[in-house]
UniProtKB/Swiss-Prot annotation:
Disulfide bonds join 135-162. It comes from Mus musculus (Mouse). Pfam families: PCNA_C, PCNA_N. The lineage of its organism: Eukaryota, Metazoa, Chordata, Craniata, Vertebrata. The modification N6-acetyllysine is found at residues 14, 77, 80, 248. It is found in: Nucleus. The modification Phosphotyrosine is found at residue 211. Signal peptide: none annotated. Auxiliary protein of DNA polymerase delta and epsilon, is involved in the control of eukaryotic DNA replication by increasing the polymerase's processibility during elongation of the leading strand. Induces a robust stimulatory effect on the 3'-5' exonuclease and 3'-phosphodiesterase, but not apurinic-apyrimidinic (AP) endonuclease, APEX2 activities. Has to be loaded onto DNA in order to be able to stimulate APEX2. GO terms for molecular function: chromatin binding; damaged DNA binding; dinucleotide insertion or deletion binding; DNA polymerase binding; DNA polymerase processivity factor activity; enzyme binding; histone acetyltransferase binding; identical protein binding. Homotrimer. Interacts with p300/EP300; the interaction occurs on chromatin in UV-irradiated damaged cells. Interacts with CREBBP (via transactivation domain and C-terminus); the interaction occurs on chromatin in UV-irradiated damaged cells. Directly interacts with POLD1, POLD3 and POLD4 subunits of the DNA polymerase delta complex, POLD3 being the major interacting partner; the interaction with POLD3 is inhibited by CDKN1A/p21(CIP1). Forms a complex with activator 1 heteropentamer in the presence of ATP. Interacts with EXO1, POLH, POLK, DNMT1, ERCC5, FEN1, CDC6 and POLDIP2. This is Proliferating cell nuclear antigen. CDD domains: PCNA.
């Protein structure tokens, strides 16, 4: 059987909020090493990859590997019934067609349990190649969310230009254009407020803001976000989940011809 208990249950609530608008259903691959999910979004434009390592859970048991087909909208509805302070336990038998979710209030005076029907999903796993990137930007996740939100009022796409001294986000549309430039921070007290840029070569790429705004739903999971870019390969937007793993989004750049058309 599979059983995983998470004292900080709010992490699972935040993960579902970050996934549910982008993907409707996905396979949760559960093994002794932890929980993994990989899925294209419903329009097959972006890819999501989630890792929650077993040691990040407070107790974790998995006797044999399971692939659980989950409707993320349904799971999100059930998790909304959990309080932010609740302890969450996930449980499934080896051949189960349901996943049990148990929510315990911290004072243990209230226990709620739900059973969610699982789905049969035929999922192909895509190999994600390890890649060296020309430009890696680490910045506060709230700042990235705000930039994407602000620029989506101007245009549908953002051009991210990365050079040694800073990174520029630009958008243009019918009302005009907007540019937001962030310089690398030299001295900040808190690491999560820093902007750091590792650049091997300059990068100038265009991405659909609609998808970046979906990705920023993961902002509550992490104070920082990492953007990794190279020409002609998908952008990686990574949110670390403290002591547990990460949530990564992949988005291919828009081709220049598409913009002209």
């Amino acid at each position: 059987m599979f059983e995983a208990r998470l004292i900080q249950g709010s992490i699972l609530k935040k993960v579902l909020e970050a996934l549910k608008d982008l993907i409707n259903e996905a396979c949760w691959d559960v093994s002794s090493g932890g929980v993994n999910l990989q899925s294209m979004d419903s329009s097959h434009v972006s890819l999501v990859q989630l890792t929650l390592r077993s040691e990040g859970f407070d107790t974790y048991r998995c006797d044999r590997n399971l692939a659980m087909g989950v409707n993320l909208t349904s799971m999100s509805k059930i998790l909304k019934c959990a309080g932010n302070e609740d302890i969450i336990t996930l449980r499934a038998e080896d051949n189960a067609d349901t996943l049990a979710l148990v929510f315990e209030a911290p004072n243990q005076e209230k226990v709620s349990d739900y059973e969610m029907k699982l789905m049969d999903l035929d999922v192909e796993q895509l190999g994600i190649p390890e890649q060296e990137y020309s430009c890696v930007i680490k910045m506060p996740s709230g700042e990235f969310a705000r930039i994407c939100r602000d620029l989506s009022h101007i245009g549908d796409a953002v051009v991210i230009s990365c050079a040694k001294n800073g990174v520029k986000f630009s958008a243009s549309g019918e009302l005009g254009n907007g540019n937001i430039k962030l310089s690398q921070t030299s001295n900040v007290d808190k690491e999560e407020e820093a902007v750091t840029i590792e650049m091997n070569e300059p990068v100038h790429l265009t991405f659909a803001l609609r998808y970046l705004n979906f990705f920023t739903k993961a902002t509550p999971l992490s104070p920082t976000v990492t953007l990794s870019m190279s020409a002609d390969v998908p952008l990686v937007v990574e949110y670390k989940i403290a002591d547990m793993g990460h949530l990564k989004y992949y988005l291919a750049p828009k081709i220049e011809d598409e913009e002209a058309s």
